[in-house]
């Protein structure tokens, strides 16, 4: 049976084994998918042994995405621009193909929600790795991006790098123009620490829709909770993105695209 895994540290909380088992059942694919704890020191060696033993592919989560990128022999364009890899596939010739399905997952979930139309203006909060992983697919979907970060130079560097792919500008988090954004995406890690992004609430109130790339199992993320407190209706966390990026990885490995929307409706958590 073909073997797959998700590598991360920590990894016990991962929903990926459940997600991929549902996809396998849905598409009649015979495969095994497990969670593997990566070692900070020996991750590269662990991964080499994993593939030497016949594994067909794996997902990579924090904190190993950049290291997996370095290990891959070939990369997709979206993986190259992200400079991070969340999906590896072993090719027939033994080489490792690196991909990044985070942005594709985000785009798929925004389409599911009906929040992605051409020529929209999207405000993205944060200019870290999460943002870098989704910029190319958003720009390819003809979105106009405003990138806001506390350190302006970091946002400017990203905007300059991605300018060839579409319309993108950088602003300081404290100087976001007060306008009606079609969509605001929180790509900061503040929710992991139980905090919200410190910014002008008027900007959130004026937005048509708001999306948090983080997700929480039992309760709203801090960002989602804040948006709801402000009376916003079109608010979502990133659980759909998690499931959709897994669907794109599954498609890369197995050649069949599972229906991720059906999984979101199941009481499987």
From Swiss-Prot:
CDD domains in the cross-refs: NAD_bind_Shikimate_DH
GO molecular function, one term: NADP binding
Keywords tagged on the record: Amino-acid biosynthesis, Aromatic amino acid biosynthesis, NADP, Oxidoreductase
Pfam families linked: SDH_C (PF18317), Shikimate_DH (PF01488), Shikimate_dh_N (PF08501)
NADP recorded as keyword: yes
Catalytic residue list: 65 (proton acceptor)
Function (record text): Involved in the biosynthesis of the chorismate, which leads to the biosynthesis of aromatic amino acids. Catalyzes the reversible NADPH linked reduction of 3-dehydroshikimate (DHSA) to yield shikimate (SA).
Protein name, per record: Shikimate dehydrogenase (NADP(+))
Organism: Pasteurella multocida (strain Pm70)
Lineage: Bacteria, Pseudomonadati, Pseudomonadota, Gammaproteobacteria, Pasteurellales
């Amino acid at each position: 049976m073909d073997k797959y895994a998700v590598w991360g540290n920590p990894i016990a909380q991962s929903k990926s084994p459940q997600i991929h088992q549902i996809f396998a059942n849905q598409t009649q694919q015979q495969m095994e998918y497990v969670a593997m704890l990566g070692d900070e020191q020996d991750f590269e060696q662990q991964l080499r042994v994993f593939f030497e033993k016949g594994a067909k592919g794996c997902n990579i989560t924090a904190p190993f995405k950049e290291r997996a990128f370095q290990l891959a022999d070939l990369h997709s364009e979206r993986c190259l621009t992200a400079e991070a890899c969340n999906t590896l596939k072993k090719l027939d010739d033994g080489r490792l193909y690196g991909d990044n399905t985070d942005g594709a997952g985000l785009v798929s979930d925004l389409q599911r929600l009906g929040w992605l139309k051409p020529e929209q203006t999207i405000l993205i909060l944060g200019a870290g790795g999460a943002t870098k992983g989704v910029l190319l697919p958003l720009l390819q979907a003809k979105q106009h991006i405003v990138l806001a970060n506390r350190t302006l130079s970091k946002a400017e560097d990203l905007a300059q790098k991605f300018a060839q792919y579409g319309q993108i500008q950088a602003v300081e988090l404290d100087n976001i123009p007060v306008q009606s954004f079609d969509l605001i995406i929180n790509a900061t890690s503040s929710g992991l620490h139980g905090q919200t992004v410190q910014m002008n609430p008027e900007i959130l109130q004026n937005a048509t829709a708001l999306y948090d790339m983080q997700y929480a199992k039992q309760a709203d993320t801090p960002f989602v909770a804040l948006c709801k407190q402000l009376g916003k209706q079109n608010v979502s966390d990133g659980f759909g993105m998690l499931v959709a990026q897994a669907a794109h990885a599954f498609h890369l490995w197995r050649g069949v695209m599972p229906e991720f929307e059906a999984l979101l409706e199941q009481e499987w958590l």
